[in-house]
Amino acid sequence: MNINVADLLNGNYILLLFVVLALGLCLGKLRLGSVQLGNSIGVLVVSLLLGQQHFSINTDALNLGFMLFIFCVGVEAGPNFFSIFFRDGKNYLMLALVMVGSALLIALGLGKLFGWDIGLTVGMLAGSMTSTPVLVGAGDTLRHSGIASTQLSSALDNLSLGYALTYLIGLVSLIVGARYLPKLQHQDLQTSAQQIARERGLDTDANRKVYLPVIRAYRVGPELVAWTDGKNLRELGIYRQTGCYIERIRRNGILANPDGDAVLQMGDEIALVGYPDAHARLDPSFRNGKEVFDRDLLDMRIVTEEIVVKNHNAVGRRLAQLKLTDHGCFLNRVIRSQIEMPIDDNVVLNKGDVLQVSGDARRVKTIADRIGFISIHSQVTDLLAFCAFFIIGLMIGMITFQFSNFSFGIGNAAGLLFAGIMLGFLRANHPTFGYIPQGALNMVKEFGLMVFMAGVGLSAGSGISNGLGAVGGQMLIAGLVVSLVPVVICFLFGAYVLRMNRALLFGAMMGARTCAPAMEIISDTARSNIPALGYAGTYAIANVLLTLAGTLIVIIWPGLG
């Protein structure tokens, strides 16, 4: 039996789509030196090559892909978006505005200088900024702009062409810039990180190992009684000295949970909870042959839970004010916008932050009720909320504003982004509403993006050869300028206007570019995860601004002449 592969793919859009995705994902795993191509560029390259052979898919698949992607971007940004917008994230908001605004203005200027159309200009902006939200926002606005079908087809083709030609330029140049810009500016990020660590009491070890606390029990003998000298537990300050916490006392056969006024007596059996190194710091009078192995005394259920910060008595407060250790709980991690933060007593908690806490199950539950709620460890997505807010986003996107003879619509991209932000925000405030496991959210977002990239590549592939020959050199120059000049402007603004700590500033700059690989370079240079504070501060707002930038550039382009 002979199978004509070309006819088979042309006759089955679904098969063609998944062939493009599979081949593109394989290509995306390749590395050029230390830089991995990535899934987006892999799928785009394969789809462009197949598009040259006149393969195509239904545009409905492309539209659904971008809708899923942009909605999930909003859901991820939602928990922290409003706290960054309205509170102490003013500096981060301003940095993101400077980064996105300067890139937008430079792209507009270069587009007019080289005589490009709107498609090439926006594609170059999206690729140079390695920002798919720009591409998605612009593509949706173009489709609803009312321009002639031939112009629309050309603009959409050039959109993906500009993105494909400048994406690697933007990615590689930013990674190189992240490595060498601190040196060119004579900035010692390691010293800056250590400086802010001393000021705030941060843990500067980016690779800090996390252990579960362990339970050990000891019998109080004459040496320990002499060591306590009649002081109560509060006066002894065992936790302050060692990091261990007395969880239980058995006295005369009765188990009890002690308070700070308890005084140790001869014959007491005490259960201490702490990390392994904390037990090693105990005074020798605890350990000298007096360890007790008793099921009832040691029978505590130590759990590790992820607590989502929600309640007003925790939001806006410093981490130290929670006094977790006073309640027998141990903090392992602080996570904001999926970025692990340094454990810093002076970190101000935002709504939606996640604290990974270990301790006795009862105590952890008490802490969770006080500051928020325990993240649901369910693998079931609230599909009803997902679909309802998706519908709301589409309806918002249908709104059109009319000014005299000029009209413009909000568009699906902005509508879905707003609806996603609201769903994410409500999820951070109501533990049983709108739950989407992070793995499921990542999968839907990535799948939507890959479908969108496959669609734009297949539709633009037939004209890539002519386009490359006509604008290839110009694209190289423009890509480098748009990728690096806004970073330099952002650095100057943050350093000399906002006067930010350099380690935080460089992290915030990478967050404003939404570039995780460059963030890793900055953390390695600083030998600290302190820059993650800055990255998390700008990342969520930058994703939103970049989507709006793609919409805005299409709206204002006709008025520039």
UniProtKB/Swiss-Prot annotation:
GO terms for molecular function: monoatomic cation transmembrane transporter activity. It is found in: Cell membrane. It comes from the Bacteria. It holds the Pfam family TrkA_C. Signal peptide: none annotated. PROSITE patterns: RCK_C (PS51202). Keywords: Cell membrane, Membrane, Repeat, Transmembrane, Transmembrane helix, Transport. GO terms for biological process: potassium ion transport. One of its GO terms (cellular component) is plasma membrane. The keyword Cell membrane applies. InterPro entries: AAE_transporter, RCK_C, RCK_C_sf, Transp_YbjL_put, YidE_YbjL. The chain crosses the membrane at residues 8-28, 32-52, 66-86, 94-114, 158-178, 383-403, 406-426, 447-467, 475-495, 540-560. It is a multi-pass membrane protein. Residues 200-288, 292-373 form the RCK C-terminal domain. Belongs to the AAE transporter (TC 2.A.81) family. YbjL subfamily. This is Putative transport protein YbjL. It comes from Salmonella dublin (strain CT_02021853). The lineage of its organism: Bacteria, Pseudomonadati, Pseudomonadota, Gammaproteobacteria, Enterobacterales.
